[in-house]
């Protein structure tokens, strides 16, 4: 027999948890739980990869959640008022997949057999949009802890906005030792307690095991005490992992707590009842092997030599979720039909968009004025906020600095659950994951801000947002050495290049206030995460962007200046490509190049604003060639790393060192971001190209080093 847990091992099918003879229904439930344990062994074994032990230990918990507690409709997985389920310890994904299959979400037994295989719906960790019923992408430990808090904020905000008849659900989050060791869990749990978020039920799978071995190797936190200090309701239920009635009672107690989040501490035994792997690190992340599986199945009363065994009566037990969920949803639909609220606002909120015509409220900025793009965003947000019903904004202690202050909006709090202003505190990582949770909950379009350099603190959350196509908007400001005296610790250099390399993330760096308005419009209308990269310093509002940005920005790149004076005969001699605060420098440099100087002929330079590479790459070849014609030398000008610019440019004025502490204008000048220096580099590029064209045929088929003219530090 396996090593039994100290208190309550799984009762044999013939007995109830209290030792009394079990009813046929109880016997069927226990068989169902054991079938889930069997699937948790079979799928990783077939894949020769996967995490078995946690799924086995938590099978009774999953059974209680999906059959007794949670409100959901498998036939309509996106029903707005469903309870949300987040598996933060996403390595136990086979547990979730098994429940989605059994409960009728559309997964099949063949999908379970294809666990972790190319093209299957059952990936190694849960992925939003990959299979029905997966609320959010998890896997990197702790992310689900913070995303669940975001879902709790969304539920409270929407309940206050639209009423409890339409929004009345719980968020359940399962997390493990690893999740709670991660720093993001501290950030998120602290804020959840401060916000007094009820309807938020976390189950801590306290199994004392990590990959390296027992948690005592590196972890001795008093977890209940820690969460009590955060202001949570804590229920340490001990050894009841196999007692379904005790589990249900604990969950319902937690669900009744309305004024604070709840933590149920559950002592489980990873891999139980495996005779040799229970409570071992090997049970965490490896298939059990055929012999161990056979012995364990015999203990569980399953056919030892049959894989993926699901008897009809077990499938019928779990498929009761379909009519039960349909009845719950239809009752909700009746309430919705009789609701007298603002349906246009409801529809727009759940679509993550503005009301019809919202973009007509975008401000137009006066040419010639000086406006930092972070201040332009502030103006855009406040001009349109009332027409974007789901808009919620906040920052990591930089609300005013990053342009995300909603004038007149209440602070999100127990006293003002309708509050649209979230003060995340100095918790960038939690903010990022909470934004993803809000977006995937639905009904909320979150905007979150911090200094661009500190986007690094958010990076794991941003990556999951991009992977899962969460509709979130990041306001990352103070975007270059132009921020000034705070120096290189706060001056972003490599961030633009690294974030552009992230699949699924739109990175937009507007040249001035009018471009910023168009970027805000595109971000609100988007369906994926958008990062707005904005200046601290004032920038001139350009006449050229005022005329052309409304049609050009959404295409990612467009011609700002064909040639000073407007001449359009023949191709340009040179193309200057700029983003953000460097576009106006390029415009001024083009004017200098157009003027004949002593010993230098006039140069006809085109200026291109390229605010968003992702949008530009989405255009057809003809459009891209019309903006960046082939065969014309190109010089890119951007106050960040040169990495990646060889896609578009022959040379760059860029920064490949860390910055320096100095007033912003001085720092930009020292690093070469002046019209005079850009014009000088442009002439050097033209000279190099002409010299190259005179080489012999062998040299002509080669290319000069595109990086010869990169700036590497102060000039």
Residue ranges: model-predicted function:
Residues 117-129, 147, 157-168, 185-309, ...:
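Thiamine diphosphate
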Residues 80-81, 262-356:
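Terminal amphipathic helices with adjacent charged low-complexity linkers/tails
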Residues 57-195, 405-406, 434, 438, ...:
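Cofactor-binding active-site loop characterized by glycine-rich and histidine/acidic residues
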Residues 73-74, 155-165, 440-457, 472, ...:
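Glycine-rich phosphate/pyrophosphate-binding loops
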Residues 330-471, 528, 549-559, 577-580, ...:
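Non-catalytic terminal/interface segments that mediate subunit docking, oligomerization
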Residues 26, 43-52, 80-88, 131-142, ...:
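A short glycine/serine-rich beta->alpha loop
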Residues 35-49, 204-207:
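N-terminal capping segment at the start of a domain
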Residues 47, 83-84, 134-137, 164-182, ...:
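A short, small-residue-rich loop immediately preceding and capping a beta-strand
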């Amino acid at each position: 027999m396996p090593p039994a847990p100290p208190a309550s091992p799984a009762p044999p099918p013939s007995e109830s948890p209290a030792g009394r003879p079990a009813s046929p229904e109880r016997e069927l439930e226990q068989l169902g739980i054991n079938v889930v344990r069997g699937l948790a062994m079979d799928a990783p074994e077939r894949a020769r990869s996967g995490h078995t032990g946690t799924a086995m230990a938590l099978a009774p918990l999953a059974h209680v959640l999906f059959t007794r507690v949670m409100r959901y409709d498998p036939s309509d997985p996106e029903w707005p008022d469903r309870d949300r389920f987040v598996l933060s310890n996403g390595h136990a994904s086979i547990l979730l997949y098994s429940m989605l299959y059994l409960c009728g979400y559309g997964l099949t037994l063949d999908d379970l057999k294809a666990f972790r295989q190319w093209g299957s719906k059952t990936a190694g960790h849960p992925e939003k949009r990959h299979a029905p019923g997966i609320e959010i992408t998890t896997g990197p430990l702790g992310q689900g802890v913070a995303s669940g808090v975001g879902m709790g904020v969304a539920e409270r905000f929407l309940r206050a906005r639209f009423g409890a008849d339409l929004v009345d659900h719980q968020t359940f989050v399962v997390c493990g030792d690893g999740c709670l060791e991660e720093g993001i869990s501290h950030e998120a749990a602290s804020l959840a307690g401060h916000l007094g978020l009820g309807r938020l039920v976390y189950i801590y799978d306290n199994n004392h095991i990590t990959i390296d071995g027992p948690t005592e190797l590196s972890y001795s936190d008093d977890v209940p005490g820690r969460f009590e200090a955060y202001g949570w309701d804590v229920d340490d239920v001990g050894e009841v992992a196999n007692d379904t009635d005790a589990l249900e009672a604990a969950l319902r107690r937690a669900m009744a707590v309305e004024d604070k989040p709840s933590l149920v501490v559950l002592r489980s035994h990873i891999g139980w009842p495996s005779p040799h792997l229970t409570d071992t690190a090997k049970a965490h992340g490896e298939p059990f092997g055929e012999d161990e599986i056979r012995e364990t199945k015999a203990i569980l009363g399953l056919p030892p030599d049959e894989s993926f065994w699901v008897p009809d009566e077990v499938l019928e037990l779990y498929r009761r979720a379909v009519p039960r969920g349909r009845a719950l949803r239809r009752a909700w639909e009746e309430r919705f039909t009789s609701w007298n609220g603002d349906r246009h606002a409801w529809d727009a909120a759940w679509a993550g968009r503005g009301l019809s015509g919202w973009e007509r409220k975008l401000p137009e900025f006066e040419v010639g004025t000086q406006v930092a793009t972070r201040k332009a965003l502030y103006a855009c947000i406040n001009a349109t906020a009332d027409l974007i019903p789901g808009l919620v904004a906040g920052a990591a202690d930089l609300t005013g600095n990053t342009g995300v202050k909603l004038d007149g909006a209440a602070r999100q709090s127990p006293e003002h659950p309708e509050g649209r202003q979230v003060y995340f505190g100095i918790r960038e990582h939690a903010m990022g994951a909470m934004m993803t949770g809000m977006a995937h909950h639905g009904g909320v379009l979150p905007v979150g801000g911090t200094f661009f350099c500190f986007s690094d603190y958010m990076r794991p959350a941003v990556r999951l947002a991009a992977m899962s196509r969460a509709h979130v908007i990041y306001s990352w400001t103070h975007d270059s050495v132009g921020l000034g005296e705070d120096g290189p610790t706060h001056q972003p250099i490599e961030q633009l290049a690294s974030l552009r390399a992230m699949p699924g993330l739109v990175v937009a760096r507007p040249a001035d206030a009018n471009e910023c308005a168009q970027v805000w419009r595109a971000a609100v209308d988007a369906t994926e995460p958008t990062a707005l990269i904005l200046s601290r310093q004032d920038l001139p509002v350009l006449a050229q962007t005022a005329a052309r940005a409304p049609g050009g920005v959404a295409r990612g790149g467009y011609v700002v200046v064909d040639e000073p004076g407007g001449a359009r005969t023949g191709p340009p001699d040179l193309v200057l490509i700029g983003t953000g605060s460097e576009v106006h420098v390029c415009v001024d440099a083009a004017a200098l190049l157009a003027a004949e100087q002593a010993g230098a002929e006039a140069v006809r330079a085109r200026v291109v604003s390229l605010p968003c590479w992702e949008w530009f790459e989405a255009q057809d070849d003809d459009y891209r060639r019309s903006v960046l014609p082939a065969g014309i030398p190109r010089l890119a000008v951007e106050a960040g790393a040169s990495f990646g610019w060889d896609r578009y440019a022959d040379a760059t004025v860029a920064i490949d060192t860390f910055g320096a502490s100095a007033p912003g204008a001085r720092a930009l000048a020292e690093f070469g971001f002046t019209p005079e220096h850009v014009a000088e580099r442009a002439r050097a590029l033209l000279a190099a190209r002409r010299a190259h064209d005179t080489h012999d045929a062998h040299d002509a088929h080669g290319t000069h080093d595109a990086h010869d003219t990169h700036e590497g530090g102060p000039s």
